[in-house]
């Protein structure tokens, strides 16, 4: 089942799905697996497995530290793909690769997408790859049935959102605020308005991220 169909099926029984995040190899892969066991037991629907990178430009200090510590411990891309395969075979939630374009560039876009597919992943999030430079990667992804997750931001014009919407597959990631991950987002009508703006330009499911950190945040978004 594709990512969009999976989300729509899950939403028949839940008015809000949960997407969680793990930095591969931090503090260790065994700890990651324990975290994922808890996530599965508490009903998480989608998990991003972040492949650590030395310059994680979209991430805040906590995530930067996690990336650095994982790399210092020797985490490799191959280990991350092996772990993704273990996770996708063990749990029923959908798994996404989250990382930076350098990973795809260094191994080649075709191999990158194929490795995600072979590891049981449903898609990927590469926040540093502009949609204008992603046509080949997206074409390869479509051939393999892997979804490129597009980011829509509050600073994007409607014209820009329309362009992003045309490229969206599986789901889009609405960035709740300007800045980097890991900091608190103050839930307000601005976030709801962003979701409404995104909805005008895409028919795929919308996930909201960056600083969603509490039940109160999720309750605020419920039904939006």
What are these regions, as identified by a protein language model?
Residues 18-22, 47-49, 95-99, 124-126, ...:
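Hydrophobic faces of well-ordered beta-strands that scaffold small-molecule active sites
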Residues 22-23, 28, 98-106, 130-131, ...:
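Glycine-rich beta-to-alpha transition loops that act as phosphate-gripper elements at the mouths
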Residues 43-45, 116-122, 142-149, 166-172, ...:
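Glycine-enriched alpha-helix->loop->beta-strand junction motifs that scaffold or abut catalytic
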Residues 146-182:
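Histidine/lysine/aspartate-rich catalytic loop segments that bind and position anionic ligands
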Residues 1-10, 53-63, 72-85, 104-110, ...:
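Active-site-adjacent beta->alpha loops and helix N-cap segments on the catalytic face
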Residues 20, 39, 47-50, 116, ...:
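Conserved, mostly hydrophobic/aromatic
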Residues 5-27, 60-62, 66, 87-98:
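N-terminal small/glycine-rich loop or linker at the start of catalytic domains
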Residues 29-41, 156-167, 208, 212-224:
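Catalytic cores of alpha/beta
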């Amino acid at each position: 089942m594709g990512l969009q169909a999976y989300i729509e099926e899950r939403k028949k029984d839940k008015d809000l799905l949960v997407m969680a995040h793990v930095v591969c190899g931090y503090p260790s892969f065994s700890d990651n697996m324990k975290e994922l066991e808890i996530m599965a037991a508490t009903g998480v629907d989608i998990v991003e497995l972040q492949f650590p990178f030395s310059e994680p430009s979209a991430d805040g200090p906590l995530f930067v530290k996690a990336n650095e510590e994982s790399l210092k411990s020797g985490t490799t891309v191959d280990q991350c793909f092996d772990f993704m395969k273990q996770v996708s075979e063990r749990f029923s939630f959908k798994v996404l690769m989250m990382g930076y374009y350098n990973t795809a560039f260094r191994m080649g876009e075709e191999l990158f997408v194929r490795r995600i597919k072979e590891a049981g992943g449903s898609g990927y999030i590469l926040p540093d790859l502009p949609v204008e430079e992603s046509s080949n990667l997206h074409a390869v992804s479509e051939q393999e049935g892997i979804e490129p997750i597009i980011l829509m931001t509050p600073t994007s014009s409607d014209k820009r959102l329309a362009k992003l919407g045309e490229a969206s597959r599986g789901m889009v990631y609405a960035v709740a605020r300007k800045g980097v991950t890991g900091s608190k987002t103050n839930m307000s009508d601005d976030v709801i308005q962003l979701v409404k703006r995104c909805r005008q330009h895409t028919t795929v499911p919308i996930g909201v991220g960056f600083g969603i950190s509490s039940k109160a945040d999720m309750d605020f978004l419920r039904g939006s």
